[in-house]
Amino acid sequence: MKKILVTGSGGIGGVNFVRALKIFSDKFFIVGTDFNKYYLQFADIDQRIISPKHSDPDFINFLNKITEKYKIDFIHPQPSSEALVISQNLDSITTKTLLPPPNVISTDKLETQKILSKLGIFVAKTKVIANYEMISNIFEELGSGPHWIRAKTGAGGNLSLLCN
């Protein structure tokens, strides 16, 4: 039985990743972490562990302790913020993971949109709103809506607002 550690397992991405694993096979023992004790309840995992935030200096050490305790075969960091920290510390991680170098992980949603667009991948029409005065011009340019206003960085739909 393979043992997988899913960080951020309580967020929608983590929940969906775990569901996909369970559809594929029941031969996984899944340890899930999340810093939010309430979100942690959402995932269908075998072991729940409240974690420090990815910005905590002890985050990598925390993951290594879990890896050792549960004999984890693979770490899947779900939110991009945690993937970035783990990618920056690949030499310190004591088990397998599949991550690109930190310079490849973009946490800037606008930059990600530009990269995807240049690769020919369809993306939503995107405009930057730098100040309050630009809002009316954006609606004139894009039409009446609905439109999403999003923060450039963050996870879990943080600061998302649907506007009509």
Model-inferred region functions:
Residues 42-128:
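Conserved N-proximal alpha/beta basic substrate-recognition cap immediately N-terminal to
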Residues 1-4:
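Extreme N-terminal starter segment of soluble prokaryotic enzymes
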Residues 33-39, 80-81:
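Short, polar loop motifs at secondary-structure junctions
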Residues 10:
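N-terminal Rossmann NAD(P)H-binding glycine-rich loop of SDR-like oxidoreductase domains
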Residues 103-164:
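Active-site nucleotide/adenylate-binding loops and adjacent lid/helix of ATP-dependent enzymes
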Residues 38-41, 135:
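Short, charged/polar "capping" segments at the starts of alpha-helices
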